Each structure stands twice: as structure tokens, then as C-alpha cells.
From Swiss-Prot:
SMART domains: Haemolytic. This is Putative membrane protein insertion efficiency factor. It comes from Staphylococcus epidermidis (strain ATCC 12228 / FDA PCI 1200). Disulfide bonds: none annotated. It is a peripheral membrane protein. Could be involved in insertion of integral membrane proteins into the membrane.
Length: 83
């Protein structure tokens, strides 16, 4: 339920608020897309945490660049992969 609410808020922002503002995100994917992917992949709480952490890095003093959502750690090894 919380996951759906958070995703709805991000989609609302992407569709209705973001188009009204100049593009300023220093990252790829954008902070809103990153947050959306993080919530979809990691769930509501960890995804929201990752999204907020990313948004706090998005300022003129940070170089930005490619910054994908981190993968989940495999409990049986030290590698990461999608489930």
C-alpha cells in the first residue's frame, strides 16, 4: 500500500510538476526516475531512503553523472544481481 502511494506521488511529480520546471538534475537517471526505480526494486522504505539520499546529492557542488539504483546483495555470495 505504501509502495503504491509513494510511486503515485513520484509519477504525479514526473507528469505534472517536472515539465513546468527547467531540467536541473545532475544525474542519469534523473532523481525522480531513480526514486521510482528504487521504490519499485527495493520496496517503499529502502527505496524512499535511497531516493532522498540521491536528491540530497543533487546540487551544484556535486559532479553528478551516471548513478543507477544499487542492486540487492545476494545473501549467499558477495555478488549482486536482480531477482
Amino acid at each position: 500500500m505504501l509502495k503504491k502511494i509513494l510511486l503515485s506521488l513520484v509519477v504525479f511529480y514526473q507528469r505534472f510538476i517536472s515539465p513546468l520546471t527547467p531540467p536541473t538534475c545532475r544525474f542519469y537517471p534523473t532523481c525522480s526516475q531513480y526514486t521510482r526505480e528504487a521504490i519499485e526494486y527495493h520496496g517503499a522504505l529502502k527505496g524512499l531512503y535511497l531516493g532522498v539520499r540521491r536528491i540530497l546529492k543533487c546540487h551544484p557542488l556535486h559532479k553528478g553523472g551516471f548513478d543507477p539504483v544499487p542492486l540487492k546483495k545476494d545473501k549467499n555470495s558477495k555478488t549482486t544481481h536482480h531477482h
